[in-house]
Amino acid sequence: MLPEEHQVHGAFFGLWLCPDIPGLVWLGIVAVVFAVTLAKEANAQSRGVYPLGMSAANSGVTPEPGFTYSNQLLFYSRDEVKDQNGNTVPITGSNVVLMDMNSLIWVSAKELLGGARYSAFATLPFARNDLTSDIHGNISGGNGFADSYYVPFVLGWKRKRVALRLLYGFLAPTGRFAAGANDNVGSGYWTNALSSGQTFYVTKDMSWAFSAYEMYEFHTTQEGTGTHPGQTFDLDYSLARIFPFTKAPSLQIGIAGYQQRQTTATTGPAITPEETTERYAVNALGGLTNVTFSRPRVSLGFKFFEEFANRSTFQGYSVQFSGSVRF
């Protein structure tokens, strides 16, 4: 039996990872160079709003009919800045993001459109983010209720060795955001998201599963700044071995990864012509493990990702914990 916490895909919140950086103190030539460079990176090199890696396992699987509560604790730490060629920018500092994602999912027992099950869910997140440099200390950071994600339309199909899901959702800017503030938690703009998840059971006994989850983000203009973030393509994936023990919890172990690509230009009054040509890219590889208990119906999971070969963004690692319970 597959872990249910990874049967909830697309649940995410929008976090403006790199808020505006006002009032940096000028501490001589070195400090000026650092501040200008970091401000440029922070304004031009932000990522998409989807928390990468969270849907890497069992991406096409629909939960069983009824209600499921899912919680995911996602930690991202980045201590390198990459330019558009993938070279490390000589800046010392860190960008840390911590997210607590609370999702309530409902799945219908009825079938339609060739055996599809309809479902819907909402994700209410809490977040904390910090941007710190060795020269200036804490530059910006915020914590509190973040942007919430609502998915009113999900269709899921299941065949003998294939599971597929199609989703539409939108990100509402419910998190705190003010142009120029250094304690933002929300993104300050709406995002429409189309996504799909697939799980293919490679072997006849269904002990090996390959999963992939794709999302395309359509961003609107940011409130108060006039900045229109570029659209984003996200990809999570995994290859996992399932051990369905008869009198013990089932175990899933495998490799996992994620990618993210900016597909269109970021534009706005504060964006330079040079910055409109830049496109961020994120890559990561790691592993996952999940444990599922049949009574009560509880699932627990862990994932770790190490990023590499990023461009025009920060680079680091991610640690992710998850759990779910079906009512």
What is each model feature region?
Residues 46, 59-66, 108-118, 157-164, ...:
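Short loop/turn motifs that connect adjacent beta-strands in outer-membrane beta-barrel proteins
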Residues 95-155:
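Long, hydrophobic/aromatic-enriched structural stretches that serve as scaffold segments
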Residues 59, 71, 102-108, 150-156, ...:
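Residues on the lipid-exposed face of transmembrane beta-strands in outer-membrane beta-barrel proteins
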Residues 82, 88, 224-327:
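Outer membrane beta-barrel transmembrane domains
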Residues 38-44:
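Sec/Tat signal peptide C-region and signal peptidase I cleavage site
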Residues 65, 94-102, 116, 139-149, ...:
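Residues that define the transmembrane beta-barrel architecture of outer-membrane proteins
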